UniProtKB/Swiss-Prot annotation:
This is Chaperone protein dnaK. InterPro entries: ATPase_NBD (IPR043129), Chaperone_DnaK (IPR012725), Heat_shock_70_CS (IPR018181), HSP70_C_sf (IPR029048), HSP70_peptide-bd_sf (IPR029047), Hsp_70_fam (IPR013126). GO terms for cellular component: chloroplast. It is found in: Plastid, Chloroplast. It comes from the Eukaryota. Acts as a chaperone. PANTHER family: HEAT SHOCK PROTEIN 70KDA. Keywords: ATP-binding, Chaperone, Chloroplast, Nucleotide-binding, Plastid. Residues 598-621 are annotated as: Disordered.
Length: 621
């Protein structure tokens, strides 16, 4: 088995790590950073950008720059009304599925495809770092992700060319790195507030066993929502003062979003900061500028409802674990949004102790995923991870009621069965609707899928015995089987249909990704070639100027002609010519070095004219 990596596929940033020498190590990306922005963009010329380079050009290309896509993965139209308002790109629906419009390519992407581009970037950079091709991974998801979102994450990995060995919960991964050396039993509360999701898990950790006691969360709450509070405040204030609604301007909205995120980050260390956005818009009277001072107090006031919402899953997780706050030994903070002072104060108030600050909240999840990857690869011994299912699972029964078969916070993998019967006499079949959620009625829970069991023997209602078995694997992905005991007839469903992508679409996307791999690599190579050539032209002009009096006129003319020829090929994007001309220019620059060295040597020899200066030296006393 080759190297198995651990990946934290985040809303804002993503991280990849691996076990090296028995220790988990974060792998830097090609740009040298330990985190990679979860941003994908397409330029007008069709070039794909991933990571920080994509984020940097978002203001000038808002409709083709896709960020926070994790908030849409595995979701249906009726689940994203809040998130749609926060993007500068166009999110639309195709049936019940979500699509992201890319005007630059005149194409629609599934969220899984965009996430796959981020995964591909992480894996390619890791393969270069490790010197071997990475094909297997453990990927983390928020603990409160439902079955659809988990399956969609797995699909994204598949589209990226990965064999996803395990999907594990983010707040479960975090203690794997934190508690690796713990010998004594401790009860840990993991508070995981990321860019787009929020989870709280309570675990028992000690002697290599990591047992999740409970988990709770909110997949509609994260750092993006804190940014949005600032954005809406700025829009409202600008409209009152200038009479202009910036919400209708995509470019202005993107600038506001970036400025809000920057202000939020700065207010974690400062008590106030300035937001200055010159030329935010223009009218007939001329350009308009936005200048605003934001204090930490104002930020906390704007976000007070979000901060209050964070306390609910904490209380729920403690209640489900049947623990008091005083029973918690350690609080581990995960996710960049936990740097907000008001969040840290709220956690301290609820639990009664200072959070543990020894872990890097941006990296701890990926490090934990790498530990789990090491377990699966056989590199790490004596570690046992006992995770739970975050939401109850059941079926619809008579009257539109959800009957729970597996309660939330059940340790996985698990398998449970219940026996049901028919509702009317001589009923030939039953339709089984699989549900996930905590509400009592079917309509208030999420439907994961429906299947039908035919061939039931004619009998009075209540006589046939239909055994429904729920089986959850270690990834938290569900399969359901129904069996009529009298006839032995059975029908089953693996809830992969819960993914927003049909199997055919996933396979098509995998094929497209493979087919486009060479094209993408060629584009990347062309961009690198172009950048190197432009740099070479600059260096050549600089050297001609610097050594003008030390090189021959013929060499100077030759280099100037090569620069002109190279710039012409750059303009026409003739990449083969660019490479050959660059090589010739490089050779000529070496000639400059030789001539300059010869000229320098000649000057040194000329200065030594053999004259002897007659003088006396006195002896040093």
């Amino acid at each position: 088995m080759g190297k198995v990596v651990g990946i934290d596929l985040g809303t804002t940033n993503s991280v990849i790590a691996v076990m090296e020498g028995g220790k988990p190590t974060v792998i830097p990306n090609a740009e040298g950073f330990r985190t990679t922005a979860s941003v994908v963009a397409y330029t007008k010329s069709g070039d794909k950008l991933v990571g920080q380079i994509a984020r940097r050009q978002a203001v000038i290309n808002p409709e083709n720059t896709f960020y926070s896509v994790k908030r849409f993965i595995g979701r249906k139209q009726n689940e994203i009304s809040q998130e749609i308002r926060q993007t500068s790109y166009n999110v639309k629906t195709s049936g019940s599925s979500i699509k992201i419009a890319c005007p630059a390519l005149d194409k629609d992407f599934a969220p899984e495809e965009i996430s796959a581009q981020v995964l591909r970037k992480l894996v390619e950079d890791a393969s270069t770092y490790l010197g071997e091709t990475v094909t297997q991974a453990v990927i983390t998801v928020p603990a409160y992700f439902n079955d659809s979102q988990r399956q969609a994450t797995k699909d994204a990995g598949k589209i990226a060319g990965l064999d996803v060995l395990r999907i594990i919960n983010e707040p479960t991964a975090a203690p794997l790195s934190y508690g690796l050396d713990k010998q004594n039993n401790e009860t840990i509360l993991v508070f995981d507030l990321g860019g787009g999701t929020f989870d709280v898990s309570v675990l028992e950790v000690g002697d290599g066993v990591f047992e999740v006691l409970s988990t709770s969360g909110d997949t509609h709450l994260g750092g993006d929502d804190f940014d949005q509070q600032i954005v809406e405040w700025l829009i409202k204030d600008f409209k009152q003062n200038e009479g202009i609604d910036l919400a209708k301007d995509r470019q202005a909205l993107q600038r506001l979003t970036e400025a809000a995120e920057k202000a939020k980050i700065e207010l974690s260390n400062l008590t106030q900061t300035e937001i200055n956005l010159p030329f935010i818009t223009a009218t007939q009277d001329g350009p308009k500028h936005l200048e605003k001072t934001v204090t930490r107090g104002k930020f906390e006031e704007l976000c007070s409802n979000l901060i209050d919402k964070c306390s609910i899953p904490v209380n729920n997780a403690l209640k489900d674990a049947k623990l008091e706050a005083s029973s918690i030994d350690e609080v581990v903070l995960v996710g960049g949004s936990t740097r907000i002072p008001a969040i840290q104060q709220m956690v301290k108030r609820l639990i009664g102790k200072d959070p543990n600050q020894s872990v890097n909240p941006d990296e701890v999840v990926a490090i934990g995923a790498a530990v789990q990857a090491g377990v699966l690869a056989g590199e790490v011994k004596d570690i046992l991870l006992l995770d739970v299912t975050p939401l109850s699972l059941g079926v619809e029964t008579l009257g539109g009621v959800m009957t729970k078969i597996i309660p939330r916070n059940t340790t996985i993998p698990t398998k449970k069965s219940e026996v049901f019967s028919t509702a009317v006499d001589n009923q030939p079949n039953v339709e089984i609707q699989v549900l996930q959620g905590e509400r009592e009625l079917t309509k208030d829970n999420k439907s994961l899928g429906t299947f039908r069991l035919d061939g039931i023997m004619p009998a009075p209602r209540g006589v046939p015995q239909i055994e429904v078995t729920f089986d959850i694997d270690a990834n938290g992905i569900l399969s359901v089987k129904a069996k009529e005991k009298a006839t032995g007839k059975e029908q089953s469903i693996t809830i992969s249909g819960a993914s927003t992508l049909p199997k055919d679409d996933v396979e098509r996307m995998v094929k497209e990704a493979e087919e486009n791999f060479d094209t993408d690599q060629k584009r990347r190579k062309n961009i690198d070639t172009k950048n190197q050539a432009e740099s070479l032209c600059y260096q050549a002009e600089k050297q001609i100027k610097e050594f003008e009096d030390k090189i021959s006129q013929d060499l100077k003319t030759k280099i100037e002609e090569l620069i002109t020829e190279l710039r012409s090929s750059l303009e026409k994007e003739e990449y083969e010519n660019i490479e050959s001309i660059s090589q010739r220019l490089q050779n000529s620059l070496m000639d400059i070095g030789k001539m300059a060295a010869q000229a320098e040597s000649k000057n040194t020899n000329t200065k030594d004219d053999g004259t002897v200066i007659d003088t006396d030296f006195s002896e040093a006393k």
